[in-house]
């Protein structure tokens, strides 16, 4: 609706992908066709003025006509933030998953590395996932700790519905040493 408001035309928007419920997107890419010419700054101001406070456009640029946000993307990156503390998170509760058990970082790293490469991830998707191909290629994994936060980053050609959430949940169960 934000683009329709500033272009006064019905505009089809292509997104690079969906996010699962409760997931926050950084650098989500989308594209649309328009004949309207504006400076980048004016596009950004106009779109942002018509978006909710929780969404912001940071960059705008022209792309070739055959560009498609979803199918031109070669990689998607997902960071999962765990707050690992006995104390309740005060400011980051909507941006992290709270785990009170002490998690073994080396176990997390070892388990995460097992996902690298091309695999069938059927066991790591939602029962409502409609993807015809459960085979995905994970090209990068990383684990960082900052104070009580554990940040797990995974890059792949694509993800299945709830794939990272289920993978990380499984790794957390293993890392609890229960």
Short names for language-model regions:
Residues 2-178:
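Structured-RNA-binding interfaces characteristic of tRNA pseudouridine synthases
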């Amino acid at each position: 609706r934000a683009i329709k408001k500033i272009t006064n035309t019905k505009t089809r928007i292509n997104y690079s992908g969906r996010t699962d419920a409760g997931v926050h997107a950084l650098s989500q890419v989308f594209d649309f066709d328009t004949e309207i010419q504006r400076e980048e700054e004016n596009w950004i101001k106009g779109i942002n003025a018509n978006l909710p406070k929780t969404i912001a456009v940071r960059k705008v640029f022209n792309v070739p006509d055959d560009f498609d946000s979803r199918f031109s993307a070669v990689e998607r990156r997902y960071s999962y933030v765990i707050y690992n503390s006995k104390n309740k998170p005060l400011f980051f509760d909507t941006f992290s998953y709270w785990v009170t058990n002490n998690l073994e970082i080396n176990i997390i790293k070892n388990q995460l590395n097992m996902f690298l490469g091309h695999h069938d991830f059927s066991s790591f998707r939602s029962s409502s996932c409609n993807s015809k191909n459960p085979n995905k290629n994970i090209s990068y994994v990383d684990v960082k700790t900052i104070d009580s936060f554990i940040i797990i980053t995974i890059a792949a050609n694509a993800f299945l519905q709830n794939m990272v959430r289920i993978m990380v949940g499984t790794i957390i169960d293993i890392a609890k040493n229960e």
